[in-house]
């Protein structure tokens, strides 16, 4: 599970997901990538589930890069608690993903296998995605 070592703030505000991703919009490390088409909070559990789905599909061949990290803590109040009495305690960590961000990359496998592995990973995520090939289009 991906969890930040140290936080600047324990309970940050939620913020807004305006606009498109500034950086990380192209395949940098591998040959193939999985790009987000919608804005969302991706939890550390979803990232881990997608990673496991990809690595199981490609078995021992290939290498996988995870380009997003869940830096943002999300708080939650306990069940059946009255309103007020402060903000809830941090429950999970999320990565803020904007449209255009390449979340996962892969190399060392064929395009068909990479496409299938990325499809399995995309099913674990709550957003629409697309498959990218380095240097080319989708």
Curated annotation (Swiss-Prot):
It comes from the Bacteria. One of its GO terms (molecular function) is rRNA binding. HAMAP family: Ribosomal_uL16. Belongs to the universal ribosomal protein uL16 family. It holds the Pfam family Ribosomal_L16. This is Large ribosomal subunit protein uL16. Part of the 50S ribosomal subunit. The gene is rplP. One of its GO terms (biological process) is translation. Signal peptide: none annotated. One of its GO terms (cellular component) is cytosolic large ribosomal subunit. Disulfide bonds: none annotated. Keywords: Ribonucleoprotein, Ribosomal protein, RNA-binding, rRNA-binding, tRNA-binding. PROSITE patterns: RIBOSOMAL_L16_1. It comes from Rubrobacter xylanophilus (strain DSM 9941 / JCM 11954 / NBRC 16129 / PRD-1). InterPro entries: Ribosomal_uL16, Ribosomal_uL16_bact-type, Ribosomal_uL16_CS, Ribosomal_uL16_dom, Ribosomal_uL16_sf. Binds 23S rRNA and is also seen to make contacts with the A and possibly P site tRNAs. The keyword Protease does not apply.
């Amino acid at each position: 599970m991906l969890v930040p070592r140290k936080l600047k703030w324990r309970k940050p505000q939620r913020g807004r997901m305006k606009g498109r991703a500034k950086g990380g919009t192209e395949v940098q490390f591998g040959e193939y990538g999985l790009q987000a088409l919608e804005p969302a909070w991706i939890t550390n559990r979803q990232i881990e589930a997608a990673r496991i789905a990809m690595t199981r599909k490609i078995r021992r061949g290939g290498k996988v890069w995870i380009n997003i990290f869940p830096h943002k803590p999300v708080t939650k109040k306990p069940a059946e608690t009255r309103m007020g009495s402060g903000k809830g305690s941090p429950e999970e960590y999320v990565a803020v993903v904007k449209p255009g961000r390449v979340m996962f990359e892969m190399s060392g496998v064929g395009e068909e296998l990479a496409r299938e592995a990325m499809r399995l990973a995309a099913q674990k995520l709550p957003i629409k995605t697309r498959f990218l090939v380095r240097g080319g289009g989708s």
